[in-house]
Amino acid sequence: MKKYKAQFIEFMLDRKILTFGEFILKSGRVSPYFFNAGLFNKGSDLIKLGRFYADALIDSGIECDLLFGPAYKGIPITITTAMALYANHHLDLTYCFNRKEIKDHGEGGGLVGGALQGKVLLVDDVITAGTAIRESVEIIHAHSASLAGILVALDRQERGNGTLSAIEEIEQKYQSKVISIVTLEDMIHFLKNEKTMIEAFSALNKYAEQYGVLRKNL
């Protein structure tokens, strides 16, 4: 596992972004883990978070002209990612985000930031049903820009109603690569080597066997 991935998992555990137990999902499934991106709520969190997103983007090799953050959670993530890309990788990208309600005074419009054009990387926390992604892609295409890819913190690697995960469905629908800082598979591999987390490892591994779409046998 790459260093930044392990460090991100440690960061999530330390800030209790990632917790273990029994959590009922909207689908009715009982998940052994819970990811709460809303707890990235301190200045120090955002600085670290931006670095992890930036590392994942650079590692992916995806090229883009602009970062787009869907309101609301995608906004701070996109801004801190843009800052980290410049500070740590000397990559100075424009960013942009949408408003939930279109403003009809001042600068007006439904977007804030740079002009939405060129190759756009969509940045968000996670993909569940894919509704926010669909709305964002519609905005991107409405401005004659192209979707370069999608960057999220966590790929749950979990089947929906069919055989594909939410991310695989998005990739198939929009013919664009979805990259993540970590995956469920990464978390399982990390926990496997943590003697104090044997119970969590066992629960995640069992859940992955039942609902997962992992790329290889764990």
Curated annotation (Swiss-Prot):
It holds the Pfam family Pribosyltran. It comes from the Bacteria. The keyword Membrane does not apply. GO terms for biological process: 'de novo' pyrimidine nucleobase biosynthetic process; 'de novo' UMP biosynthetic process; pyrimidine ribonucleoside biosynthetic process. InterPro entries: OPRT, Or_phspho_trans_dom, PRibTrfase_dom, PRTase-like. It catalyses: orotidine 5'-phosphate + diphosphate = orotate + 5-phospho-alpha-D-ribose 1-diphosphate. One of its GO terms (cellular component) is cytoplasm. The keyword Ribonucleoprotein does not apply. Keywords: Glycosyltransferase, Magnesium, Pyrimidine biosynthesis, Transferase. One of its GO terms (molecular function) is magnesium ion binding. Catalyzes the transfer of a ribosyl phosphate group from 5-phosphoribose 1-diphosphate to orotate, leading to the formation of orotidine monophosphate (OMP). Belongs to the purine/pyrimidine phosphoribosyltransferase family. PyrE subfamily. This is Orotate phosphoribosyltransferase. It comes from Hamiltonella defensa subsp. Acyrthosiphon pisum (strain 5AT).
